[in-house]
Amino acid sequence: MKIAALILSLALITGVSVQPAFTQNHEGAVRFNFYGDTVVFDFDPATRVEFDGPLSAENIQSFYEAISKTDYKAIVSVLLKYKEQHKPDDWLFYQLIRKAAQQISPKAENYGRYTLYKWFLLSKSGYDATLAISNHRILFYVQSDENIYNIPFRMRDGKQYVCLNYHDYGSIDFDKEKFTEVAIKTPDAQKAFSYKVTSLPGFTTADYEEKDISFNYYQTDYHFKVKLNPQVKTIFTNYPVVDYASYFNIPLSKETYSSLIPSLKKNLKGMNTKNGVDYLMRFTRYAFLFEKDTDAFGKEKRMSPEETLLYGQSDCEDRAALFFYLVKEIYNLPMIVLAYPKHVTIAVKFDKPIGHAIVYNGSKYSVCEPTPQRDDLQVGQLLPDLKKSSYEVVYVYNPQAY
C-alpha cells in the first residue's frame, strides 16, 4: 500500500516549516487521509485569522489583509508541490483545498470563515477566484472557460465565473436576493479552472468493497465481483453537470478497472465485434435498475461510469456513459452520442452498418440502446418513438483523433 505523507505547516502567524515525510507524531499535528495520501500539518487554532463580523466588502478586505500578512506562501507552496507530484485534476485539487480549509476553520463552526479560507487558498494557488455577498450569504466563484450547467455563474469582463459552493445553500432566488461581487485583486491569480476529470486517485486497496453484479445474456447468467470505492461518490457529490465531451471521458479507478474489464474481455473471447458490443450493451442495460435522476437525487446528475457501478439505479445518460466507456476500452470503435429531447443513446461505427444507421459526416453509425425499454432492442434498432424525433450529435469519438 502506497501512502504519500504530505507535511503541511499551517502556523499562520508564528511561521511555517515543511518537514520530511513520515515524521514522528507530535503535539499539535493534524492528520487526515486524502484519497490514499496521508496529509499532516501543524496548526495552532490560536493563530487562525478570525471572521466574526457581518458580511461586507470591508470586512472581507480586512480578512484578506490580515491573512496576507501571515506566512501563507509556504502553505501554498506545499499544496502546489502536492499538485506537481500527484497531478490531480483541478476538481481533485479543489477537494484537497476543501479538506485543508476544514482543518484550519471547520465549516460547521464558522461557514463564512471556512469559505474565505477556501477562496484564499485557491486564489493563492493561482486560480482566478472571486466572491459575491448578499446580506447573509457568501458565494465563492472560480473562472472557467468550460460549459457548466445547473449551477449559477457570473460574467465579468467577458469571463465566466462558476459558483463552487451553491450546493451549501440548496437554492437561491437571485431575483429576490441581490448579490454584490467582492472583487479583491490577488496577484498571479489568473488561471482558469477546469472541471475535466481525466484520472481518479490511487486510493488504497482497503478502501474498496466488493459488489456482486450480474445479468442474463441469452439464457446464460454472468456474475461479476467488482471492486468499488464509496469515496468516488464523495468526489462527485457536488460535481456539476458538464458537457458530454468531459463527462464521457471520466475513467474508472484502477482497482475497479482491473476487477471488471479483464472479466468482460474473458467473456467476450471468441465473439465477433458485433456480438461483443451486443454483450456490453445488454450488460449495461440489464445489470442495473432504472431510475430518473429527479426521483433518485431530486435534480439532474450525470454519473461517471464508476458511479453507475456504485449506485443501485441509473438513467439513460448514465448508462450511455458506461456503455461508451466499455466499448472504448475494449473495442475502441468510433462512436457518436445522440441527444434526443428526452433521451440519450449511443451509435457505434462497425465495419458494416447494422440495422438502423445514423449518418454523420459521411459515416454510418448503428444505434446501440444501453437503457432498458419495453421492447428487447437489438443492435441497430432505434426506439420506435424516436424514429421521427429530432436529435443532436453532442459528442463524437474518433479513435484516430486520440
Task: Locate predicted features.
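Positively charged n-region of N-terminal signal peptides that target proteins for export
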Residues: 1-7
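Bacterial N-terminal signal peptides
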Residues: 7-15
